[in-house]
């Protein structure tokens, strides 16, 4: 179950009118931290992200079910929504703790997350990435906008 702090951050994001994916980002960050500390486990980076998104759905974030994935995955996402706010059994909890001890933490290293972010970005079109960057720039203040512009200029120079 996600921490109260994480739920509060997500609620704050919702109150500020941020998108459900931004709200869910809080849960993904929380999940990554838990895996790094050895509280949770994931076999790969995508799984770590999926667990965070699943927790977000359980906490009531209005995330749509994943586009890619069969009916099984969509059914599981629907179950997560239905399980929101229900307690977890002790037996399940004990089994989970035992299983977590065998899981690696390298799946959420900065290198692994960087690799995952790059591969996810490659799947999007250039215009889609550009549109997302412009939207992000609109939501930033002047200082952050300036930093983003400098970073964009560096990237353009590097890619020439």
How should each PLM-predicted stretch be described?
Residues 1-160:
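A charge-rich, low-complexity, intrinsically flexible signal that marks solvent-exposed coils, linkers
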């Amino acid at each position: 179950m996600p921490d109260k702090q994480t739920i509060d951050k997500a609620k704050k994001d919702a109150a500020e009118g941020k998108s459900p994916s931004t709200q869910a980002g809080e849960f993904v960050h929380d999940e990554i931290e838990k895996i790094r500390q050895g509280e949770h486990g994931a076999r790969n980076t995508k799984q770590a992200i999926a667990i965070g998104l699943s927790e977000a759905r359980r906490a009531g974030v209005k995330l749509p079910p994943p586009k890619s994935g069969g009916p099984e995955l969509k059914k599981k996402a629907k179950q997560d929504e239905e399980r929101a706010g229900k307690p977890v059994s002790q037996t399940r909890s004990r089994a989970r703790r035992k299983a977590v001890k065998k899981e690696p933490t390298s799946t959420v290293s900065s290198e692994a997350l960087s690799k995952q972010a790059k591969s996810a970005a490659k799947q999007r079109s250039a215009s889609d990435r550009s549109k997302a960057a412009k939207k992000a720039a609109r939501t930033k203040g002047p200082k952050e906008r300036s930093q983003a512009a400098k970073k964009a200029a560096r990237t353009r120079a590097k890619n020439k």
